Amino acid sequence: MTSSTQPYLRHLGQLCAFGLALASPLHAETNPPTPGHLKLIAPLDRPEDGYCLDILGSGSHIRFDLPMTAHNCKPGLYADEAVVLEQHGYIRFPAYNKCATAAGLNGRALPGAAMVARDCGERSPFMEAETLQIFVFKKNGQVELSGSGLCLTAGPESASTFSEDHRWRALYLERCTTADSARSRWQFTIPKAQHNSR
């Protein structure tokens, strides 16, 4: 190596180190995603508030052991309906650090599979959640379990909850090509009034 190339190589090394530092997660922007509702575009029988992805229960009575539902969207942002959409496909409930998960076996869900809230990336007996938690948001508003051809769909019927003022519908996966568009097209919305109740 000649003395004339040493400054060039030293400068190149400094530039490479600077580039690596910029690419480091420590230097990446760390703004957390904003929570909001995953809401059906069509309001169905709830013209005043529509239906949102919901974990069954309320307050200290959240039921992670039961299937998720499409529940009429609550005013503001309650913990059991507040989700963030992660870049790699998780639909995460930040208050509980749980992710929307298709009920399935061997990493595969079938049409009609329920949705449950499980630990993000969970690996436990009979639950390899990673492939059952990655969703793709299609341009038409459908939310597909990645690579499955199955889309998040609300049931055709609604019923009252413990309060006559509230309604719920079953929530499951249906073939994207045959799912009723009014019950399978979703949007991410941020409510104007934030409630943040647990």
Q: Which sequence ranges carry the predicted segments?
A:
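Bacterial N-terminal signal peptides
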Residues: 13-23
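Intrinsically disordered, low-complexity segments
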Residues: 1-2, 22, 179
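Lectin-like carbohydrate-binding module/patch detector with strong preference for beta-trefoil
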Residues: 28-198
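Bacterial N-terminal signal peptides that target proteins for export
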Residues: 2-15
